[in-house]
Every structure is written in structure tokens, then in C-alpha cells.
Amino acid sequence: MRQQRLAYSLGLLVLICVYFFLRTDLANSSVQSRLQTCSEGWYITGYYVPREDELPDTAEQISVERMGDLSFSQKFLSEIRTEGWGITRFGWALGYYSGRWHRSDVGALDAAGNLLVDGAIAIDRALIPRGADVQISTLPTPWATKTFRATDIGNGIVGQHIDVFTGTGLAAEEETFRITSNNNRVCFMSN
């Protein structure tokens, strides 16, 4: 009887150990799937959304999809051609892509048509997966401590190049100049 109890207890102990071993192994697998990947030598640039009221200039007439002909500041239009989107004096966003001008009532959009938000970055999807959390610790404060989200792409974003969205207006433009740099350390975790 005593030997049966001992064998039963020993069997139960083995089962408990196997259970915890498997549980720990599975937990480690899920941690490993979210391990951070880091590398050096990244080129970082910034992009922003210009405001028409901050860029007065001679008026230029353009044709906006589904709206017709409208006039905007030439400096403003030039910035949009570079940056992708801008906020008009009317309060809606004006975008330039596929060789045409477009209106968005919700704001500036990323390449997938989603609202462009703080913390967004444009990446080369061959190197960083879409939706990955990205940290660039070599940027100046406060950017070095931010966690960015890889949600956007851009024509000029190829290889070890990340374009950080810095916000709206002239202050955001100044940040693009401040963060543009070479030889940055980039770490990311894919979701």
C-alpha cells in the first residue's frame, strides 16, 4: 500500500514537472517570436504636414479630384509635392499622389489610406515588417525614447532608410531637419 502511494505521488510529481516544462517552453517560444532585431547604419529623415496659412505666396490654380479648380499658395503646393499632404486654409487636407490632387476631410493619410498619426514611420517593408514597433535610440530628445509604428511607405524609402512623421506645421518641419542623420541604431519588434 505504501509503495502504491509512493508510486502514485512520484507519477503525479513527474506529470507536474512535464506540465511546467512544456508551459515554460511555450512561453519562451512566444517571447522568442517577439525578440528585438537591432542594426546600425540607418539613415533617418523626417516628413511633416505643411499648413497653407504658414506659407503665403502667389496663388497657383490646380484641379482637385471631385472638386474642380482651386487656387493655393505656390509654396504650399511645392511642399505638398514633396511631403504628400498639407492642411488648406479651409481646414481640410490636400494630397498629391498618382499625379493628381486629392481632398481628405479626415486629415493627411498614409500610403494605405489611413489617418497619419504621431509615431508613424515610413519604412522599406523588405527590411521592417508593416506594423512593427520601432525604436531609434540615436535620435535627439524626445525622439530617442519614442516607440514608432511602421505604418507607412514612400517612394524614396529604400534599404536602411526610415522617414519619421514629425507632425503638422512649421515647428514640425524644423523637427525634420533636427532628426535627419546618418549611422543610426534601429531596433524593431514585429507583431
Identify the residue ranges that each predicted region occupies:
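N-terminal Sec-pathway targeting helices
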Residues: 1-13
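Short, intrinsically disordered low-complexity segments
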Residues: 1-4, 22, 33
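Hydrophobic alpha-helical membrane-insertion segments, chiefly the h-region
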Residues: 14-23
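Solvent-exposed, well-ordered loop and adjacent helix/strand elements within mature globular domains
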Residues: 25-191
